[in-house]
């Protein structure tokens, strides 16, 4: 399979550190994260590839994110709001996944932050740039307490899933 040609979001994606805004600084600042933690996050993302493996089928959206600072797997039913208890404490995160088809997904989340509550919209969609397929991520965060918003646009290049799994083992 040629991993550079995609018609849907399914498969492995590696953050393109040379296109868009790969840094999460503005997002993290809006969330109220400390400067020290932001610098550590940026260092981690510079040293280790950020990989997303996406699977959309049977009305479900599954994503496995791996990076120096984030290793998680989530699965949601498309069109159904999901509440998740966060530890420690009894705070909740609410997530709603919507999709207009296999080449686009929008994950809307309301979650607690360092200084209150945030609304996040994470839109992933296929785009064609210079005859190459990329996954464009438009990540919008709004801090409900400060009313501050920030939009980050990141691009991912397609990789074979086996490549993504090899990266995790190294």
Show the residue positions of the predicted features.
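Hydrophobic small-molecule pocket/channel-lining residues, especially in calycin-type beta-barrels
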Residues: 1-170
């Amino acid at each position: 399979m040629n991993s550079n040609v995609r018609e849907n979001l399914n498969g492995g994606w590696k953050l393109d550190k040379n296109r868009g805004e790969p840094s999460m600084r503005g997002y993290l600042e809006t969330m109220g994260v400390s400067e020290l933690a932001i610098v550590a996050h940026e260092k981690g993302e510079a040293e280790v590839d950020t990989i997303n493996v996406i699977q959309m089928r049977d009305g479900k959206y599954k994503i496995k994110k791996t990076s120096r600072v984030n290793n998680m797997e989530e699965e949601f039913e498309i069109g159904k709001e999901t509440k998740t208890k966060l530890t420690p404490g009894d705070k909740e995160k609410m997530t709603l996944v919507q999709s207009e088809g296999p080449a686009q997904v929008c994950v809307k989340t309301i979650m607690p932050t360092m200084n209150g509550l945030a609304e996040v919209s994470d839109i992933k969609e296929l785009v064609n740039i210079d005859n190459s397929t990329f996954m464009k991520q438009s990540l919008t965060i709004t801090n409900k307490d400060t009313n501050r918003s920030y939009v980050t646009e990141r691009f991912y290049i397609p990789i074979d899933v086996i490549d993504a799994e090899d990266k995790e083992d190294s």
